[in-house]
């Protein structure tokens, strides 16, 4: 594994995973949101906001996220200082995102959009994560993890906002 391969792995994994989410989310929401809101009433606000995003809106939201990952990869390919840390932070955030899907599937005891690619990509994401762990210090991993999660927490609502606006 090299930093460039890690960036390519992240790009490819993201395209596959978000492709599955984009293709499946709207139909899955229509079939399952009422049951989930009944079982988990505290999630009603979150689910109702996601239900208003069309497949086109999800695709646009995923494209916005892809631009961020692609920009980090390009920076790495061009040799921009610290770009490996940015790619590592985004890779770790992607792994956290995958873990969230696995937890959702376990809680719901059913398929959730993104689960299939999570399972198929597990060997590749573990390989990438092992590379990061072997390459960075514990402090660097902690900083990259925190930064990646913050970027994910800030950008995801923004991406969903764009998706909702362009779904109307």
Question: Model-derived features: where do they sit?
Answer:
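Core segments of transmembrane alpha-helices
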Residues: 56-76, 120-126
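Transmembrane alpha-helical segments that form the membrane-embedded catalytic/substrate-channel core
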Residues: 15-23, 94-105, 151-165
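Hydrophobic alpha-helical membrane segments
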Residues: 92-101, 112-132
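Non-cytosolic membrane-interface motifs at loop->transmembrane helix junctions
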Residues: 106-120, 139-147
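N-terminal signal-anchor transmembrane alpha helix
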Residues: 1-27
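Helix-coil boundary and interhelical linker segments in multi-pass alpha-helical membrane proteins
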Residues: 1-11, 72-86, 127-143
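Cytosolic, membrane-interface loops and tails of multi-pass inner-membrane proteins
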Residues: 22-51, 165-168
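Terminal transmembrane helical module of multi-pass membrane proteins
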Residues: 125-168
């Amino acid at each position: 594994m090299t930093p460039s391969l890690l960036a390519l792995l992240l790009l490819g994994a993201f395209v596959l995973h978000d492709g599955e989410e984009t293709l499946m989310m709207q139909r899955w929401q229509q079939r399952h949101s009422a049951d989930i809101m009944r079982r988990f009433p505290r999630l009603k606000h979150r689910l109702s906001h996601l239900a208003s995003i069309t497949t086109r809106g999800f695709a646009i939201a995923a494209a916005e996220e892809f631009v961020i990952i692609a920009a980090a990869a390009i920076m790495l390919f061009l040799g921009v200082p610290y770009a490996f840390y940015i790619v590592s932070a985004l890779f770790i955030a992607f792994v956290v995102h995958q873990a969230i899907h696995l937890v959702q599937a376990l809680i719901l005891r059913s398929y959730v959009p993104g689960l299939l690619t999570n399972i198929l990509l597990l060997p590749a994401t573990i390989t990438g994560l092992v590379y990061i762990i072997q390459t960075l210090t514990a402090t660097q991993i902690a900083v990259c993890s925190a930064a990646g999660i913050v970027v994910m927490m800030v950008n995801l609502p923004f991406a969903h906002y764009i998706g909702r606006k362009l779904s109307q």
